[in-house]
A protein has these predicted regions:
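Catalytic nucleophile loop
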Residues: 58, 222-225
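N-terminal mitochondrial targeting presequences
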Residues: 24, 32-42
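FAD-site-proximal beta/loop scaffold in flavoenzymes
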Residues: 196-213, 308-390
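Glycine-rich flavin
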Residues: 44-47, 56, 63-70, 75-212, ...
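Gly/Ala-rich phosphate-binding loop of Rossmann-like dinucleotide-binding domains
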Residues: 62, 66, 229, 233-234
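Short hydrophobic core segments
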Residues: 50-52, 161, 174-184, 218-219, ...
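N-terminal chloroplast transit peptides
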Residues: 1-28
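Flexible, glycine-rich terminal cap/loop adjacent to redox cofactors
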Residues: 52-57, 61-78, 90, 94-95, ...
Length: 525
């Protein structure tokens, strides 16, 4: 089956217009005329690999493709870096870094314990300056990505590829032997919510930091909502979480979530409503008219409360950006927009369900958020590398259980593998015994020196084999500490082996050393 893809090109920075003079296929990529010194290795195609989308996943695939000597074209949609670089991971870390400094400088009790005296009333910040820091960082990283593609000889085309069943409508073409779909995702806005990106906004609008509201409601208490609650409270806002589930942070390990609630919510100007839907959210006017939020019980659907706040941030997750890509027209069924793929990232014709047998679509791959395997930037990059490995004939599948994740609050939260609740179910189903060991920041010399000794690390392991199943951490620099654990899961390293590895003293890594040693009955120094 031959697939064709038309290309929407950028008419201006802010406007996309459809151009039918271009298409892409596994088999063929048609684009507005451009010249290239690259050509496919077999001479039959202009490019070995065509990548639709240039977020972290598409960029990672492109780098590895060129590293393997494959001629590569990337159709960026005018959005090199994608969500992560332009509207997500990168600029949000800039906001967290700046607001975190403000929080630290206003924490006079903590500073005085270190022998530092600061007048909290004299600590000021520039909203515009913090917003500029985030924007400048995003632009800098985006430029680095663009330069890396150019330096390696990738053909970067501004435009978004779409599968089409009618190649006769297009004119100029460049052919590609294999095609990788990497369109990413967009914020999910629930029914009844009106977004004006001024007083009611998604994470896209929040990153611009247009104003710092006195009172902001955050709808959803996952990674995104937690991180922005950290930013807002540090800058002086009061926050109300609105969560549909019965508990805050419903996807987190419950023990970690309870500690997070104590450290990140109860000690701050934050309150919350759980078990309710924001059934209707109406924008306001800053300083003039409040945002109105009507809430209903998640079970009974009865109205329970109406809130009037200065702003509302919608942090209810993300959905795949696969609309209008021509998937349905080519007979490719999605599951709520997610493209079904096998372990090798190869696109299948439909989701697995009773009565349907997915067929492999030759030469077509889908990576990152759009396939729904794991909606993380570094997972998308791993998908891209894996797809190229399989294109090169080297069978490869990503081990998602070994991919770490982090929430960059103060203190940070990180994890790899299933939650304890999920691990208990796995052990019962598969017939093995789950072990658990913990390390504490409270007795860690480095954490005590910093005056930030709240937190813990929890190691879950298979008692029969000693293999690490999962690790969950909350505490200072948890996002950096988790990588050692992810490596252990990926390599199949046992707690017996980990307990004998020497950790630098005094460092935060000794929190993990304590947990590893505890797993085998040893005491840590």
């Amino acid at each position: 089956m031959k697939l064709y893809v038309s290309l929407r090109t950028l008419a201006s920075v802010s406007t996309l217009v459809v151009a039918t003079s271009a298409f892409v296929s596994p088999g063929s990529v048609k684009v507005p005329s451009f010249s290239s010194s690259l050509s496919a290795s077999d001479g039959e195609f202009d490019f070995d690999v065509a990548i639709i989308g240039c977020g972290v996943g598409g960029h990672g695939a492109a780098l590895h493709s060129r590293g393997q000597g494959l001629s590569t074209a990337v159709f960026s949609g005018g959005d090199v870096g994608g969500t992560c670089v332009n509207r997500g991971c990168v600029p949000s870390k800039a906001l967290l870094a700046a607001s975190g400094r403000v929080r630290d400088m206003k924490d006079t009790a903590h500073l005085e314990s270190l022998g530092i005296q600061v007048d909290a009333a004299s600590v000021n910040y520039s909203r515009e300056g913090i917003a500029a820091h985030a924007k400048n960082l995003a632009n800098r990283v985006k430029g680095n990505l663009e330069n890396s593609l150019i330096a390696l000889g990738c053909e970067v085309v501004e435009g978004r590829g779409m599968l089409t069943a009618n190649p006769q409508e297009v004119k100029d073409e460049a052919t590609g032997k294999d095609v990788i779909l990497a369109p990413g995702s967009i914020p999910f806005v629930p029914p009844g919510v009106t977004v004006d990106e001024k007083t009611v906004y998604t994470s896209d609008g929040a990153l611009e930091l247009g104003f710092v509201p006195e009172w902001v409601a955050i709808i959803g208490s996952g990674y995104i909502g937690l991180e922005f609650s950290d930013v807002y409270t540090a800058l002086g806002s009061e926050v109300t979480f609105i969560e549909a589930m019965d508990t805050l942070m419903p996807t987190f390990d419950r023990e970690i979530a309870k500690q997070a609630e104590r450290l990140l919510i109860r000690d701050r100007p934050i309150d919350f409503r759980t078990g309710v839907f924001a059934s209707e959210v109406t924008p306001g006017i800053p300083g003039v008219k409040p945002v109105t939020i009507k809430m209903i019980d998640a079970k009974t659907k009865e109205h329970v409360e109406t809130l009037e706040v200065d702003a509302a941030m919608i942090a209810t997750g993300r959905v795949p950006n696969t609309a209008n890509m021509g998937l349905v027209e080519r007979g490719i069924e999605t599951n709520r927009g997610f493209v079904n793929v096998n372990g090798k990232m190869q696109v299948l014709s439909c989701p697995e369900a009773e009565g349907s047998v997915p067929e492999l679509i030759p030469n077509l791959y889908c990576i990152g958020d759009a396939n729904g395997k794991m909606m993380l930037a570094h997972a998308a990059s791993a998908h891209g590398i894996s797809a190229i490995e399989n294109i090169c004939g080297r069978s490869h599948e990503v081990n998602h259980n070994a991919i770490p994740a982090a929430c960059f609050t103060h203190p940070e939260i990180s994890m790899v593998g299933p939650t304890e609740e999920q691990a208990i179910e796995m052990a019962e189903k598969e017939g093995w015994t789950l072990g658990k060991s913990q390390g504490s920041f409270r007795a860690n010399s480095k954490a005590l020196a910093e005056g930030e000794s709240a937190g813990m690390a929890k190691v879950l392991f298979n008692k029969e084999t000693g293999n690490v199943v999962a690790v969950h951490i909350i505490g200072l620099h948890a996002a950096d500490l988790i990588q050692e654990c992810a490596n252990a899961v990926a390599a199949g390293t046992t707690v017996q082996e980990l307990s004998m590895i020497v950790h630098t003293h005094p460092t935060l890594s000794e929190v993990l050393d304590e947990a590893f040693k505890g797993a085998v009955g040893m005491s840590a120094h």
